[in-house]
Regions:
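ATP-dependent carboxylate-amine ligase catalytic core
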Residues: 17, 22-37, 63-154, 170-173, ...
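C-terminal helical cap/extension that packs against the catalytic core
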Residues: 201-205, 209, 342-343, 382-444
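A conserved segment at the C-terminal end of the G1
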Residues: 40-44, 52-69
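Charged, amphipathic alpha-helical linker segments immediately N-terminal to NTP-binding catalytic cores
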Residues: 1-16
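Acidic, Mg2+-coordinating active-site environments of NTP-dependent enzymes
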Residues: 138-141, 161-264, 268-272, 282-319
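Residue-level signal for inorganic ion chemistry
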Residues: 10, 47, 68, 139, ...
Length: 486
């Protein structure tokens, strides 16, 4: 079987959002013999920031010497992005081999009316591939929620809920507490704590749902006064001229057991991912990585003589962590793809994510802002627009997805919020070209509202010079991109 045929089989499965998938994924995983079940897993849930946190955790662990599998969603451009080993996407021939292996089983399930959903199959493929590649540890990003998510078929050694906000309410519940409780289901078994960056009602609901928690966030003087002081402190000192963030992380002595820093740790780092929320995600990732190291070495204080042969090469200290954070790249999250005009791609897809984007952008100098906005149909569009940065012009658009929102409806939301120059677009590439044409060299073009919109813009820019790790090195002669023909 060729890759293209295998991809069609996978994309032909049910892709509806929020379908309970844990039992279906477990059924398929069992059919495969539960490959990878012996691996130490890190499980990352949350309304926002779970993908960034998963990537940061993976980067720290790789810097420490582990071979790491990373499972994330959605993909921006190619399905193979969702499953990576040591930074490399799953090989196309492996995708073909997996689909060929399960195709008879899929046919049986389809005949019985119990065919798995797309995300079930992708989750099983990730675990199958990680087992084939003989990795040391796997980091899994939850799809939706936690309790019934397909990724919940594994038993993690470390878990986190990055944040809690109103998102996927049709599946997870209408309140912050409902959503937090669903996400807290990723808590590791036994006496290991669940790490969380949630605040307010979300944090309190997680506290009641999990046996033990470790809280992460900004210091109380900078945080919501209703919140207690976090156990682990993350500070964000703003962006540099090079468009990376300055952060510091402080882990007090004794705040967390079963981790490689029981004596405490404080360090500074640069971060390619901008924003105070990313500083918090970096601190969560550091905590998760420390739990993994302690698990694999067998002791939080294991010295070189105590380590087994399989962990002898592991190196974990503040310098290693800072290098892992500094080198992590995560496309589509405040990703700067040009400087003249400043062009930023950010997949913020709910009000809380737009709030974080607005705060981050406020520290970046530019003149006028030109927004390219598209979203899914089930999102709070008016609230997202209200939370967006002050905007001089907007072009709405529709990504190539059945559940994308109507651009005309999005335009009405923009007009109702008081934005004067609003253009109803359709195709993402045309909308992006229009915004770029409007922008002067000292302006900003911001693409946001959905990772699917961001993914289409990244595909449009693929003809430009793009490094293998997702960094972009500018456009020839500083020209604005033109939409590709289809």
């Amino acid at each position: 079987m060729e890759y293209d045929a295998a991809e069609r089989v996978l994309l032909g499965l049910d892709r509806s959002d929020g379908r309970p998938a844990r039992a279906s994924a477990a059924f398929l995983w069992a059919e495969l013999g539960e490959p990878g079940s012996e691996l130490p897993f890190v499980h990352v849930a949350g309304s926002n920031g779970k993908g960034s946190t998963a990537k940061l955790t993976e980067s720290i662990l790789r810097e420490a010497g582990f071979s790491v599998g990373l499972f994330t969603s959605p993909h921006l451009e190619r399905l193979t992005e969702r499953i990576r080993v040591d930074g490399d996407p799953i090989a196309p021939d492996a995708v073909a081999a997996f689909v060929e292996r399960i195709q008879p089983w899929l046919a049986e399930r389809a005949a019985a009316g119990t065919e798995p959903a797309f995300f079930d199959a992708i989750t099983a493929m990730g675990l199958w591939y990680f087992a084939r590649k003989e990795i040391d540890v796997a980091v899994l990003e939850v799809g939706v929620g936690g309790a019934e998510d397909a990724t919940g078929i594994v038993d993690p050694v470390a878990s986190a809920v990055t944040s809690v906000s109103l998102d996927h309410t049709a599946v997870l519940g209408d309140t912050i507490a409902d959503i937090a409780i669903a996400q807290a289901a990723v808590a590791p078994p036994g006496d290991r704590p669940l790490v969380t960056g949630a605040t307010g009602a979300g944090r309190e609901a997680i506290r009641t749902a999990a046996a033990d928690i470790v809280t992460v966030g900004s210091p109380a003087a900078d945080a919501d006064t209703s919140d207690e002081q976090p156990d682990i402190i993350a500070r964000y000192d703003g962006p540099t001229e090079a468009m990376d963030g300055l952060i510091s992380v402080s882990i007090p002595e004794g705040v967390i057991e079963h981790a490689a820093f029981v004596d405490g740790m404080t360090f500074d780092s640069r971060l390619a991912l901008l924003g105070a929320h990313q500083a918090r995600n970096a601190a969560i990732a550091t905590t998760l990585a420390g739990q993994v190291v302690a698990t694999v070495t067998g002791s939080a204080d294991a010295d070189e003589s105590e380590r087994t042969a399989t962990t002898r090469a592991i190196d974990f200290d503040a310098d290693v962590i800072a290098r892992g954070l500094r080198t992590a790249r995560w496309p589509g999250r405040f990703e700067t793809v040009d400087r003249e005009p400043l062009t930023v791609l950010d997949g913020a897809h709910n009000r809380a994510a737009i709030d974080a984007l607005t705060e981050t952008l406020s520290a970046v100098p530019f003149d006028d802002l030109h927004l390219v906005f598209g979203a899914m149909d089930d999102k709070p569009h008016a609230a997202m627009i209200e939370s967006a940065p002050a905007t001089d012009s907007v072009v709405t658009c529709r990504p190539r997805l059945a559940r994308a929102a109507d651009p005309a409806m999005l335009a009405r939301c923009c007009e109702n919020s008081g934005i004067e120059q609003v253009t109803v677009g359709e195709r993402v590439d045309d909308a992006f070209a229009t915004a770029c044409d409007r922008a002067g060299p000292t302006d900003c073009v911001l693409v946001t509202g959905s990772l699917f919109v961001v993914g289409e813009v990244r595909s449009l820019l693929n003809a430009q010079s793009v490094s293998t790790d997702g960094e972009r090195h500018g456009r020839p002669d500083n020209k604005r991109p033109q939409p590709t023909s289809r």
